[in-house]
Amino acid sequence: MAAYPESCLDATVLNFVADLSLASPRHPLLCEFPPGVPFGDRTLGYREGRPGRLSQFDERYQEVEGDEVEYEDPEEEEEEGEGRGRVASLLGRPKRKRVITYAQRQAANIRERKRMFNLNEAFDQLRRKVPTFAYEKRLSRIETLRLAIVYISFMTELLQSKEEKEAS
């Protein structure tokens, strides 16, 4: 206890630690574990009333990874040579891994390069239309968009004020 400063060790903290170490059921933050349930069981959250995933509501479902779950049908007899369960999405359809070929990846890279080229060209055209000082460095995309918004607003107000003067 000498490693902790005295201010951190008030009576509440010491009582809580003592209750934890003695497994006293009188502390409100402690919960009783049913017999036979290992500590950290995923179904424990459901028993405590916490919202959980599908695997917590039915023991036939087991989480595999991400949004995938593995369903084990207790009535279905499987042989050793077959798979030990079907991996399915949450919609119940079989999960099929998408295989991307080298040619598809190359085509996607070309499309992405073309998209970025067109986007950069559009920003360059916008930079030429928006007035800036000649000695300024090249504006970033966000600076270009913000300056364009200000410029368009200014030009709109200028036109509206000119129309009001002509009308009166």
From Swiss-Prot:
Query: GO molecular function, one example?
Result: RNA polymerase II transcription regulatory region sequence-specific DNA binding
As for subcellular location, the record says:
Nucleus
Membrane-traversing stretches: none
> Which keywords describe this protein according to UniProt?
DNA-binding, Nucleus, Repressor, Transcription, Transcription regulation
Renumbered to this chain, region (Disordered) spans 65-88
GO annotation, cellular component aspect: nucleus
The job of this chain, per UniProt, is described as: Transcription factor that binds to the E-box and functions as inhibitor of transcription. DNA binding requires dimerization with an E protein. Inhibits transcription activation by ASCL1/MASH1 by sequestering E proteins.
The record's account of tissue expression is: Detected in the developing central nervous system, in particular in embryonic ventral neural tube, brain, and spinal cord. Detected in embryonic intestine. Detected in embryonic and adult thalamus, hypothalamus, midbrain, pons and medulla.
Query: Where does the bHLH domain lie?
Result: 103-155
Q: Name one GO biological process term.
A: negative regulation of DNA-templated transcription
Composition-biased stretches (Acidic residues): 65-81
Name used for this protein in its record: Fer3-like protein
List the cysteine pairs that form cystine: none
**Native source species:** Mus musculus (Mouse)
UniProt-listed InterPro entries: bHLH_dom, E-box_TF_Regulators, HLH_DNA-bd_sf
Subunit details for this protein?
Heterodimer with TCF3/E12. Interacts with the bHLH domain of TCF3/E12.
Any Pfam family matching the protein: HLH
Per its UniProt record, what PANTHER family does this chain match?
BASIC HELIX-LOOP-HELIX TRANSCRIPTION FACTOR, TWIST (PTHR23349), FER3-LIKE PROTEIN (PTHR23349:SF63)
